[in-house]
Amino acid sequence: MKSLFLSTFCLFSALCVGAQTLAPFDRSHLATFGLNNPADTTLRYAPEVASTNTAIEQPLFPTLANMVPYRIPAIAVTPKGRLIAVSDYRPCGADIGFGRVDLRYRLSNDNGGTWTPQYVLAQGDGVQGSRKCGYGDAAIVADRKSNEVVVVCVTGNTVYGHATTTRQNPNRVAVIHSTDGGRTWSHPAEITESIYGLFDQSQLGPVQSLFFGSGRICQSNRIKVGKYYRLYAALCARPGGNRVVYSDDFGRTWHSLGTIHTSPAPKGDEPKVEELPNGDVVLSSRAYGGRFFNVFHYLSHVNGTGAWENDAVHSAEMPNGVKALQNSTNGEILIVQAVERATGKKMPLVLQSVPLGPGRANVGIYFKPLTSAQTYATAKDFATDWSGPFQVSALLSAYSTMVQQKDGRIAFFYEEETYGKGLCYTNMYRPLTLEQITGGKFVAIIGLQKRRK
Protein backbone atom coordinates (compact mmCIF):
# COMPACT_ATOMS: atom_id res chain seq x y z
CA MET A 1 0.00 0.00 0.00
CA LYS A 2 2.59 2.49 1.05
CA SER A 3 4.30 4.69 -1.49
CA LEU A 4 6.43 7.81 -1.61
CA PHE A 5 4.51 9.69 -4.29
CA LEU A 6 2.70 12.90 -3.36
CA SER A 7 -0.79 13.92 -4.39
CA THR A 8 -3.85 15.70 -3.06
CA PHE A 9 -7.44 14.64 -3.19
CA CYS A 10 -10.89 16.14 -2.67
CA LEU A 11 -12.94 15.99 0.52
CA PHE A 12 -16.09 13.85 0.45
CA SER A 13 -18.81 12.95 2.91
CA ALA A 14 -19.64 9.36 3.82
CA LEU A 15 -21.71 7.14 1.56
CA CYS A 16 -24.81 5.45 2.88
CA VAL A 17 -24.61 1.75 2.09
CA GLY A 18 -27.82 0.09 0.89
CA ALA A 19 -28.74 -3.38 -0.19
CA GLN A 20 -26.74 -4.65 -3.13
CA THR A 21 -28.05 -6.79 -5.95
CA LEU A 22 -26.02 -9.68 -7.26
CA ALA A 23 -24.35 -8.80 -10.54
CA PRO A 24 -25.13 -11.20 -13.42
CA PHE A 25 -22.38 -13.35 -14.90
CA ASP A 26 -21.42 -10.93 -17.64
CA ARG A 27 -19.30 -12.32 -20.47
CA SER A 28 -18.03 -8.80 -21.10
CA HIS A 29 -16.09 -9.13 -17.83
CA LEU A 30 -13.82 -11.63 -19.51
CA ALA A 31 -10.37 -10.15 -19.88
CA THR A 32 -9.31 -9.42 -23.45
CA PHE A 33 -5.72 -10.57 -23.64
CA GLY A 34 -3.17 -9.60 -26.24
CA LEU A 35 -5.12 -6.54 -27.39
CA ASN A 36 -4.62 -2.90 -26.65
CA ASN A 37 -7.26 -1.31 -24.48
CA PRO A 38 -8.34 2.07 -25.91
CA ALA A 39 -8.41 3.46 -22.39
CA ASP A 40 -4.79 2.49 -21.80
CA THR A 41 -2.46 4.61 -23.92
CA THR A 42 0.87 3.35 -22.62
CA LEU A 43 0.30 -0.12 -21.21
CA ARG A 44 -1.01 -3.34 -22.73
CA TYR A 45 -2.84 -6.30 -21.26
CA ALA A 46 -0.76 -9.33 -20.39
CA PRO A 47 -1.31 -12.42 -22.56
CA GLU A 48 -3.11 -15.45 -21.18
CA VAL A 49 -0.74 -18.13 -19.93
CA ALA A 50 -1.60 -21.80 -20.42
CA SER A 51 -2.23 -23.67 -17.19
CA THR A 52 -2.18 -27.38 -17.94
CA ASN A 53 0.20 -28.63 -15.26
CA THR A 54 -1.40 -29.94 -12.10
CA ALA A 55 1.63 -30.12 -9.83
CA ILE A 56 3.82 -27.13 -10.66
CA GLU A 57 3.66 -23.38 -10.17
CA GLN A 58 1.56 -21.35 -12.56
CA PRO A 59 1.65 -17.61 -13.36
CA LEU A 60 -2.01 -16.74 -12.76
CA PHE A 61 -1.54 -12.99 -13.22
CA PRO A 62 1.62 -12.45 -15.31
CA THR A 63 3.31 -9.07 -15.74
CA LEU A 64 5.54 -8.74 -18.79
CA ALA A 65 7.47 -5.73 -20.08
CA ASN A 66 5.39 -2.65 -20.98
CA MET A 67 2.16 -4.22 -19.77
CA VAL A 68 -0.32 -3.31 -17.07
CA PRO A 69 1.13 -4.62 -13.80
CA TYR A 70 -0.45 -6.95 -11.28
CA ARG A 71 0.16 -7.07 -7.53
CA ILE A 72 -1.30 -8.10 -4.15
CA PRO A 73 -2.33 -11.77 -4.10
CA ALA A 74 -5.40 -12.99 -2.21
CA ILE A 75 -6.84 -16.50 -2.23
CA ALA A 76 -9.72 -18.51 -0.74
CA VAL A 77 -11.10 -22.04 -0.96
CA THR A 78 -14.81 -22.89 -0.84
CA PRO A 79 -16.35 -25.91 0.92
CA LYS A 80 -16.59 -27.63 -2.46
CA GLY A 81 -12.89 -27.08 -3.08
CA ARG A 82 -13.05 -24.22 -5.58
CA LEU A 83 -10.02 -21.95 -5.43
CA ILE A 84 -10.60 -18.21 -5.89
CA ALA A 85 -7.45 -16.24 -6.69
CA VAL A 86 -7.70 -12.43 -6.66
CA SER A 87 -5.19 -9.80 -7.78
CA ASP A 88 -4.83 -6.06 -8.20
CA TYR A 89 -4.73 -5.03 -11.88
CA ARG A 90 -3.17 -1.56 -12.09
CA PRO A 91 -3.75 0.57 -15.19
CA CYS A 92 -2.43 3.54 -13.17
CA GLY A 93 0.84 1.64 -12.73
CA ALA A 94 0.96 2.21 -8.96
CA ASP A 95 -0.68 1.36 -5.63
CA ILE A 96 -4.36 1.70 -4.91
CA GLY A 97 -5.09 5.38 -4.29
CA PHE A 98 -2.98 6.78 -7.14
CA GLY A 99 -5.48 6.17 -9.92
CA ARG A 100 -7.40 3.40 -11.59
CA VAL A 101 -6.92 -0.04 -10.05
CA ASP A 102 -9.19 -3.03 -10.70
CA LEU A 103 -9.61 -6.34 -8.92
CA ARG A 104 -9.48 -9.45 -11.08
CA TYR A 105 -10.01 -13.09 -10.23
CA ARG A 106 -9.63 -16.62 -11.55
CA LEU A 107 -11.26 -19.86 -10.42
CA SER A 108 -10.08 -23.46 -10.26
CA ASN A 109 -12.33 -26.45 -9.63
CA ASP A 110 -9.58 -29.11 -9.73
CA ASN A 111 -7.18 -28.16 -6.93
CA GLY A 112 -5.28 -25.68 -9.08
CA GLY A 113 -4.75 -27.95 -12.07
CA THR A 114 -6.60 -25.67 -14.48
CA TRP A 115 -7.95 -22.15 -14.13
CA THR A 116 -10.62 -20.03 -15.76
CA PRO A 117 -9.67 -16.90 -17.69
CA GLN A 118 -9.53 -13.69 -15.70
CA TYR A 119 -12.78 -12.01 -14.71
CA VAL A 120 -13.34 -8.51 -13.35
CA LEU A 121 -14.33 -8.49 -9.70
CA ALA A 122 -14.42 -4.69 -9.34
CA GLN A 123 -13.42 -2.08 -11.92
CA GLY A 124 -12.28 1.40 -10.99
CA ASP A 125 -13.51 4.36 -13.01
CA GLY A 126 -10.12 6.13 -12.92
CA VAL A 127 -11.76 9.49 -12.23
CA GLN A 128 -9.64 11.72 -10.00
CA GLY A 129 -11.33 12.21 -6.63
CA SER A 130 -13.93 9.52 -7.30
CA ARG A 131 -14.83 7.08 -4.54
CA LYS A 132 -14.85 4.46 -7.30
CA CYS A 133 -11.51 5.52 -8.80
CA GLY A 134 -9.94 2.20 -7.88
CA TYR A 135 -10.40 -1.03 -5.96
CA GLY A 136 -7.39 -2.83 -4.53
CA ASP A 137 -5.61 -4.63 -1.71
CA ALA A 138 -8.21 -7.40 -1.45
CA ALA A 139 -8.70 -9.63 1.58
CA ILE A 140 -10.93 -12.66 1.01
CA VAL A 141 -12.61 -15.57 2.79
CA ALA A 142 -15.09 -18.26 1.73
CA ASP A 143 -17.61 -19.40 4.33
CA ARG A 144 -16.90 -22.92 5.55
CA LYS A 145 -20.57 -24.00 5.48
CA SER A 146 -22.17 -22.20 2.53
CA ASN A 147 -21.55 -20.77 -0.93
CA GLU A 148 -20.94 -17.26 0.43
CA VAL A 149 -17.66 -15.46 -0.15
CA VAL A 150 -16.68 -11.97 0.96
CA VAL A 151 -13.95 -9.62 -0.25
CA VAL A 152 -12.93 -6.50 1.67
CA CYS A 153 -10.81 -3.96 -0.20
CA VAL A 154 -9.67 -0.36 -0.44
CA THR A 155 -11.75 1.89 -2.67
CA GLY A 156 -11.33 5.43 -3.93
CA ASN A 157 -8.52 7.85 -4.67
CA THR A 158 -6.69 8.35 -1.38
CA VAL A 159 -3.26 7.00 -0.42
CA TYR A 160 -2.90 5.37 3.00
CA GLY A 161 0.26 7.18 4.09
CA HIS A 162 -0.38 10.65 2.69
CA ALA A 163 -0.96 13.58 5.03
CA THR A 164 -4.05 14.50 2.99
CA THR A 165 -5.64 11.16 3.94
CA THR A 166 -7.40 11.89 7.22
CA ARG A 167 -10.49 10.98 9.23
CA GLN A 168 -12.35 13.60 7.19
CA ASN A 169 -10.89 12.30 3.91
CA PRO A 170 -10.24 8.66 4.75
CA ASN A 171 -8.79 5.69 2.97
CA ARG A 172 -12.10 4.07 2.09
CA VAL A 173 -13.28 0.49 2.62
CA ALA A 174 -15.63 -1.58 0.44
CA VAL A 175 -17.08 -5.09 0.67
CA ILE A 176 -18.11 -7.37 -2.18
CA HIS A 177 -20.20 -10.51 -1.63
CA SER A 178 -20.79 -13.69 -3.61
CA THR A 179 -23.53 -16.23 -2.89
CA ASP A 180 -22.49 -18.80 -5.50
CA GLY A 181 -18.95 -19.70 -4.51
CA GLY A 182 -17.23 -16.79 -6.24
CA ARG A 183 -18.83 -17.17 -9.66
CA THR A 184 -20.76 -13.89 -9.53
CA TRP A 185 -20.43 -10.91 -7.22
CA SER A 186 -22.41 -8.00 -5.81
CA HIS A 187 -21.43 -4.47 -6.66
CA PRO A 188 -18.96 -3.02 -4.13
CA ALA A 189 -20.64 -1.49 -1.08
CA GLU A 190 -18.78 1.10 0.96
CA ILE A 191 -18.51 0.48 4.73
CA THR A 192 -15.96 3.19 5.53
CA GLU A 193 -17.80 4.96 8.32
CA SER A 194 -18.80 1.78 10.13
CA ILE A 195 -15.12 0.75 10.38
CA TYR A 196 -13.55 4.10 11.27
CA GLY A 197 -16.37 4.84 13.69
CA LEU A 198 -15.31 1.91 15.86
CA PHE A 199 -12.23 3.85 16.94
CA ASP A 200 -13.43 7.46 17.06
CA GLN A 201 -13.48 7.48 20.87
CA SER A 202 -10.12 5.75 21.28
CA GLN A 203 -7.65 7.22 23.74
CA LEU A 204 -5.10 6.85 20.94
CA GLY A 205 -7.14 9.35 18.96
CA PRO A 206 -9.39 8.71 15.95
CA VAL A 207 -7.88 6.54 13.23
CA GLN A 208 -6.87 8.82 10.35
CA SER A 209 -6.24 6.10 7.76
CA LEU A 210 -6.61 2.32 7.63
CA PHE A 211 -7.00 -0.72 5.43
CA PHE A 212 -7.65 -4.43 5.94
CA GLY A 213 -4.49 -6.52 5.63
CA SER A 214 -4.61 -8.06 2.16
CA GLY A 215 -4.63 -11.79 1.48
CA ARG A 216 -6.67 -14.12 3.68
CA ILE A 217 -9.38 -13.22 6.17
CA CYS A 218 -9.50 -15.77 9.02
CA GLN A 219 -12.67 -17.70 9.83
CA SER A 220 -13.03 -19.39 13.21
CA ASN A 221 -13.21 -23.17 13.50
CA ARG A 222 -14.79 -22.92 16.95
CA ILE A 223 -16.92 -19.83 17.44
CA LYS A 224 -20.31 -19.69 15.74
CA VAL A 225 -22.80 -16.94 16.57
CA GLY A 226 -26.10 -17.36 14.76
CA LYS A 227 -25.70 -18.44 11.15
CA TYR A 228 -21.97 -17.94 10.66
CA TYR A 229 -18.62 -18.84 12.14
CA ARG A 230 -16.78 -15.72 13.29
CA LEU A 231 -14.48 -13.82 10.94
CA TYR A 232 -11.28 -12.08 12.04
CA ALA A 233 -9.37 -9.41 10.13
CA ALA A 234 -6.44 -7.19 11.03
CA LEU A 235 -6.12 -3.52 10.14
CA CYS A 236 -3.08 -1.49 9.21
CA ALA A 237 -3.92 1.84 10.82
CA ARG A 238 -2.43 5.18 11.74
CA PRO A 239 -1.84 6.59 14.21
CA GLY A 240 -1.45 3.98 16.91
CA GLY A 241 -0.66 0.84 14.94
CA ASN A 242 -2.60 -2.32 14.19
CA ARG A 243 -6.18 -3.02 15.21
CA VAL A 244 -8.11 -6.29 14.92
CA VAL A 245 -11.81 -6.59 14.13
CA TYR A 246 -14.28 -9.46 14.02
CA SER A 247 -17.63 -10.12 12.34
CA ASP A 248 -20.41 -12.53 13.30
CA ASP A 249 -22.52 -11.85 10.18
CA PHE A 250 -19.95 -12.69 7.52
CA GLY A 251 -18.50 -9.25 6.95
CA ARG A 252 -21.65 -7.15 7.01
CA THR A 253 -20.82 -5.52 10.35
CA TRP A 254 -17.56 -5.46 12.31
CA HIS A 255 -16.51 -4.99 15.94
CA SER A 256 -13.22 -4.28 17.67
CA LEU A 257 -11.51 -7.35 19.14
CA GLY A 258 -10.38 -6.07 22.51
CA THR A 259 -10.31 -2.52 23.80
CA ILE A 260 -10.17 0.34 21.32
CA HIS A 261 -7.76 2.21 23.60
CA THR A 262 -4.63 0.16 22.90
CA SER A 263 -3.03 -1.46 19.88
CA PRO A 264 -1.85 -5.09 19.80
CA ALA A 265 1.13 -3.96 17.72
CA PRO A 266 1.78 -0.19 17.90
CA LYS A 267 4.68 -0.47 15.42
CA GLY A 268 3.00 -3.07 13.23
CA ASP A 269 2.45 -2.64 9.52
CA GLU A 270 0.40 -4.90 7.23
CA PRO A 271 -1.10 -7.54 9.55
CA LYS A 272 -2.75 -10.98 9.48
CA VAL A 273 -4.55 -13.00 12.13
CA GLU A 274 -5.13 -16.69 12.78
CA GLU A 275 -7.15 -18.66 15.33
CA LEU A 276 -5.17 -20.72 17.81
CA PRO A 277 -6.27 -24.25 18.79
CA ASN A 278 -7.89 -23.02 22.03
CA GLY A 279 -9.88 -20.31 20.23
CA ASP A 280 -7.58 -17.42 21.11
CA VAL A 281 -6.30 -15.23 18.27
CA VAL A 282 -2.72 -14.56 17.18
CA LEU A 283 -1.71 -11.40 15.33
CA SER A 284 1.17 -11.62 12.85
CA SER A 285 2.24 -8.21 11.61
CA ARG A 286 4.78 -7.06 9.05
CA ALA A 287 7.99 -5.85 10.68
CA TYR A 288 11.50 -5.14 9.48
CA GLY A 289 13.49 -8.33 9.87
CA GLY A 290 10.55 -10.58 10.74
CA ARG A 291 7.08 -10.38 12.29
CA PHE A 292 5.41 -8.85 15.31
CA PHE A 293 3.36 -11.45 17.20
CA ASN A 294 0.71 -10.85 19.85
CA VAL A 295 -2.03 -13.05 21.31
CA PHE A 296 -5.61 -12.14 22.24
CA HIS A 297 -6.77 -14.20 25.21
CA TYR A 298 -10.54 -14.64 25.38
CA LEU A 299 -12.62 -14.27 28.52
CA SER A 300 -15.85 -15.00 26.63
CA HIS A 301 -15.89 -16.32 23.08
CA VAL A 302 -19.57 -15.56 22.55
CA ASN A 303 -19.37 -12.01 23.89
CA GLY A 304 -16.04 -11.27 22.20
CA THR A 305 -14.41 -10.12 25.44
CA GLY A 306 -10.78 -10.58 26.41
CA ALA A 307 -7.46 -8.78 26.10
CA TRP A 308 -4.28 -8.60 24.06
CA GLU A 309 -0.96 -9.06 25.81
CA ASN A 310 0.75 -5.83 26.82
CA ASP A 311 3.58 -6.06 24.30
CA ALA A 312 4.00 -7.44 20.81
CA VAL A 313 7.02 -9.71 20.33
CA HIS A 314 9.47 -9.33 17.44
CA SER A 315 10.04 -12.79 15.98
CA ALA A 316 13.67 -12.21 15.01
CA GLU A 317 14.57 -11.45 18.63
CA MET A 318 13.36 -14.84 19.86
CA PRO A 319 15.29 -18.14 19.85
CA ASN A 320 14.79 -19.81 16.45
CA GLY A 321 12.30 -17.13 15.48
CA VAL A 322 10.98 -16.21 12.04
CA LYS A 323 13.42 -13.96 10.17
CA ALA A 324 13.01 -11.81 7.08
CA LEU A 325 16.52 -10.61 6.32
CA GLN A 326 16.76 -6.92 5.40
CA ASN A 327 13.10 -6.50 4.47
CA SER A 328 9.66 -5.61 5.78
CA THR A 329 7.00 -7.36 3.72
CA ASN A 330 3.46 -8.68 3.92
CA GLY A 331 3.23 -12.43 4.53
CA GLU A 332 0.67 -15.02 5.61
CA ILE A 333 0.02 -17.12 8.71
CA LEU A 334 -1.96 -20.36 8.50
CA ILE A 335 -2.63 -23.23 10.91
CA VAL A 336 -3.46 -26.66 9.47
CA GLN A 337 -3.94 -30.11 10.96
CA ALA A 338 -1.02 -32.47 10.35
CA VAL A 339 0.49 -35.79 11.35
CA GLU A 340 4.07 -36.01 12.56
CA ARG A 341 5.60 -38.86 10.61
CA ALA A 342 8.11 -39.85 13.28
CA THR A 343 5.46 -40.37 15.96
CA GLY A 344 2.17 -40.70 14.09
CA LYS A 345 0.69 -37.99 16.34
CA LYS A 346 -1.87 -35.51 15.04
CA MET A 347 -1.21 -31.88 15.87
CA PRO A 348 -1.74 -28.33 14.58
CA LEU A 349 1.05 -27.02 12.37
CA VAL A 350 1.63 -23.27 11.92
CA LEU A 351 2.98 -21.91 8.65
CA GLN A 352 4.38 -18.37 8.29
CA SER A 353 5.55 -16.97 4.96
CA VAL A 354 8.05 -14.14 4.50
CA PRO A 355 10.71 -13.14 1.97
CA LEU A 356 13.77 -14.83 3.41
CA GLY A 357 15.95 -12.10 1.93
CA PRO A 358 18.25 -10.39 1.75
CA GLY A 359 15.71 -7.78 0.70
CA ARG A 360 12.49 -8.67 -1.05
CA ALA A 361 13.69 -11.97 -2.44
CA ASN A 362 13.52 -15.71 -1.88
CA VAL A 363 10.01 -16.00 -0.47
CA GLY A 364 9.78 -18.97 1.86
CA ILE A 365 7.78 -20.64 4.63
CA TYR A 366 8.67 -21.29 8.27
CA PHE A 367 6.76 -23.91 10.24
CA LYS A 368 6.10 -24.79 13.87
CA PRO A 369 4.22 -27.77 15.34
CA LEU A 370 1.95 -26.85 18.24
CA THR A 371 2.76 -29.93 20.30
CA SER A 372 1.07 -28.58 23.44
CA ALA A 373 -0.82 -25.56 24.71
CA GLN A 374 2.46 -24.25 26.12
CA THR A 375 3.83 -23.69 22.60
CA TYR A 376 1.33 -20.86 22.11
CA ALA A 377 0.46 -19.88 25.70
CA THR A 378 1.97 -16.41 25.23
CA ALA A 379 3.25 -14.35 22.32
CA LYS A 380 6.81 -15.16 23.38
CA ASP A 381 6.03 -18.87 23.43
CA PHE A 382 4.44 -18.64 20.00
CA ALA A 383 7.37 -16.67 18.54
CA THR A 384 9.95 -19.21 19.74
CA ASP A 385 11.29 -22.42 18.14
CA TRP A 386 10.25 -22.30 14.50
CA SER A 387 11.73 -24.66 11.92
CA GLY A 388 12.70 -24.33 8.30
CA PRO A 389 12.47 -22.27 6.28
CA PHE A 390 11.42 -23.89 3.04
CA GLN A 391 12.42 -21.63 0.13
CA VAL A 392 9.65 -21.31 -2.47
CA SER A 393 11.22 -18.76 -4.84
CA ALA A 394 14.81 -18.13 -5.87
CA LEU A 395 13.92 -14.77 -7.44
CA LEU A 396 13.02 -11.30 -6.23
CA SER A 397 9.68 -11.87 -4.52
CA ALA A 398 7.47 -10.12 -1.99
CA TYR A 399 3.88 -10.51 -0.75
CA SER A 400 2.42 -13.98 -0.21
CA THR A 401 -0.70 -15.71 1.06
CA MET A 402 -1.97 -19.28 1.32
CA VAL A 403 -4.89 -21.59 2.07
CA GLN A 404 -5.20 -25.36 2.31
CA GLN A 405 -6.75 -27.04 -0.71
CA LYS A 406 -9.25 -29.89 -0.51
CA ASP A 407 -6.49 -32.33 -1.52
CA GLY A 408 -4.43 -31.29 1.51
CA ARG A 409 -1.83 -29.28 -0.38
CA ILE A 410 -1.10 -25.66 0.43
CA ALA A 411 -2.20 -23.25 -2.29
CA PHE A 412 0.70 -20.80 -2.07
CA PHE A 413 0.06 -17.54 -3.94
CA TYR A 414 2.90 -15.02 -4.09
CA GLU A 415 4.50 -12.11 -5.93
CA GLU A 416 7.63 -12.75 -7.97
CA GLU A 417 9.65 -10.98 -10.67
CA THR A 418 9.17 -14.05 -12.82
CA TYR A 419 9.76 -12.51 -16.24
CA GLY A 420 12.80 -10.37 -15.53
CA LYS A 421 14.47 -8.29 -12.86
CA GLY A 422 12.97 -4.83 -12.64
CA LEU A 423 9.58 -5.81 -14.02
CA CYS A 424 6.55 -5.55 -11.78
CA TYR A 425 5.53 -8.69 -9.95
CA THR A 426 3.72 -11.65 -11.44
CA ASN A 427 1.29 -13.31 -9.03
CA MET A 428 2.36 -16.95 -8.97
CA TYR A 429 0.39 -19.97 -7.74
CA ARG A 430 2.26 -23.00 -6.46
CA PRO A 431 0.70 -26.04 -4.74
CA LEU A 432 2.91 -27.43 -1.99
CA THR A 433 2.59 -30.53 0.18
CA LEU A 434 3.34 -30.36 3.88
CA GLU A 435 6.04 -32.95 3.20
CA GLN A 436 7.76 -30.47 0.89
CA ILE A 437 7.46 -27.57 3.31
CA THR A 438 8.63 -29.53 6.36
CA GLY A 439 11.29 -31.71 4.74
CA GLY A 440 9.20 -34.85 5.16
CA LYS A 441 8.49 -34.36 8.87
CA PHE A 442 4.74 -33.73 8.54
CA VAL A 443 1.92 -34.85 6.28
CA ALA A 444 -1.52 -33.32 5.84
CA ILE A 445 -4.31 -35.31 7.46
CA ILE A 446 -6.39 -34.97 4.30
CA GLY A 447 -3.56 -36.27 2.13
CA LEU A 448 -2.85 -39.10 4.59
CA GLN A 449 -6.48 -40.24 4.53
CA LYS A 450 -6.49 -40.35 0.74
CA ARG A 451 -3.36 -42.50 0.63
CA ARG A 452 -4.82 -44.96 3.16
CA LYS A 453 -7.99 -45.56 1.14
PLM segments and residue spans:
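Asp-box/BNR beta-propeller blade signature and adjacent active/binding-site loops
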Residues: T21-K453
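Bacterial Sec-dependent N-terminal signal peptides
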Residues: M1-T21
